[in-house]
């Protein structure tokens, strides 16, 4: 174990480490409290906020490749990093092809009842991610929710028609679960992507609205 690695983690120990004279810069991720503590430590700090990254699959896209890359990203460390995709926005003309390709590559679409069950276990009453299911497999999430998930499933997908508290999968999910949207045309898809970014993660990957158009 390197000498620079803390083997016992406590709030007090983390606070002392951030204020230590030999620490030149803090890269803080893990939530707003952690970022606030880093900014208040007196040491130069860079804070990382939640990422709510959407992936738009446009009608001329190579669908198998797009789906493969999304799944590879979402299943890396079971989506414990905030840079992984959180939502898929499919262009209407290729929606069916996208759905079929996800299933072919290990996607498991949840029906409305299953989606409600999964939402109830991966989020708490305040709408925050349940820490016990961060970075857990689709099978473990399914077991916790009382939803049968086969061994072939690599990611879970839930259809959503909007963004906000009434649509729980529209926020960051640090586990292999994706929201699925369908929009007709890149303009509508762009608006949906902006809506997702503005709901949670605004400024994380996008600062200038004009830059995407």
Residue ranges of model-derived segments:
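Conserved C-terminal structural/oligomerization subdomain of aldehyde/semialdehyde dehydrogenase
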Residues: 147-213
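Glycine-rich oxoanion-binding loops at beta->alpha junctions
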Residues: 2-13
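ALDH superfamily catalytic-core signature
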Residues: 35-164, 189-193
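Structural motif
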Residues: 27, 56, 89, 178-180, ...
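Short, surface-exposed connector motifs at secondary-structure boundaries
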Residues: 16-25, 198-204
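Glycine-rich phosphate-binding loop
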Residues: 26-38
């Amino acid at each position: 174990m390197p000498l620079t690695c803390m083997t016992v983690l406590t709030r007090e120990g983390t606070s002392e480490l951030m204020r230590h004279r030999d620490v030149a810069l803090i890269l803080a991720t893990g939530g707003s409290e952690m970022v606030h503590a880093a900014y208040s430590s007196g040491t130069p700090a860079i804070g990382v906020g939640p990422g709510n990254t959407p992936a738009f699959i446009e009608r001329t896209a190579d669908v198998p490749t797009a789906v493969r890359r999304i799944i590879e990203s979402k299943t890396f460390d079971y989506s414990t990093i905030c840079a992984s995709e959180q939502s898929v926005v499919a262009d209407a003309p290729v929606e069916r092809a996208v759905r079929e390709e996800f299933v072919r590559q290990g996607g498991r679409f949840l029906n409305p009842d299953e989606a409600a069950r999964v939402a109830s276990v991966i989020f708490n009453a305040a709408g925050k991610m349940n820490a016990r299911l961060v970075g857990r497999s689709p099978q473990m999430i399914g077991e916790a929710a009382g939803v049968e998930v086969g061994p072939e499933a690599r990611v879970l997908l839930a259809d959503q028609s909007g963004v906000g508290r009434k649509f729980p999968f529209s926020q960051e999910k640090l586990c292999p679960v994706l929201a699925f949207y369908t929009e007709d045309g890149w303009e509508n898809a762009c608006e949906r992507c902006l809506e997702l970014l503005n709901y949670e993660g605004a400024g994380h990957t996008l600062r200038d609205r004009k830059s995407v158009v």
